[in-house]
A protein has these predicted regions:
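Acidic, low-complexity cytosolic segments
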Residues: 1-23, 32-124
Length: 124
């Protein structure tokens, strides 16, 4: 039996987190905004979404540092139709998840934290 390649492991992490019932879609991006893998349909301009999300995360990290705050845990973008939550997954990657508007945010954040730790382990 052959070992899974890192990309297969990352795709498995996304599929697992999407099974929670609270998360609609998810993606992993490099901190510079390059798509690593995603469960989003191609028609949604995934590359643009992850690039803009990484830019927002980086800007929020700079703002937090300038304000003397601790390291940034996450960004949450809310609209009436849903949420986009981004969190660091080690020094190399970001985990981005899309949810509906009426989620149990605490449960989602716990699942995101577990998934980001797994991503960090895969990417080293």
């Amino acid at each position: 039996m052959s070992e899974k390649r890192p990309i297969e492991m990352l795709e498995g992490i996304l599929k697992e987190i999407n099974k929670t019932g609270q998360i609609d879609e998810s993606a992993i991006a490099s901190r510079s905004g390059l798509l690593i893998c995603s469960t989003l349909p191609e028609k949604q301009h995934v590359e643009t979404l992850v690039a803009m999300s990484a830019t927002m995360f980086g800007a929020a990290e700079i703002a937090a540092t300038e304000l003397g705050l601790d390291l940034l845990d996450r960004i949450v973008i809310e609209s009436k139709n849903g949420k986009l939550i981004g969190t660091g997954a080690g020094p190399k990657a970001l985990l981005l998840v899309m949810t509906g508007p009426d989620i149990n945010l605490g449960l989602v954040l716990v699942e995101i934290q577990k998934a980001s730790e797994k991503i960090k382990q895969v990417l080293g």
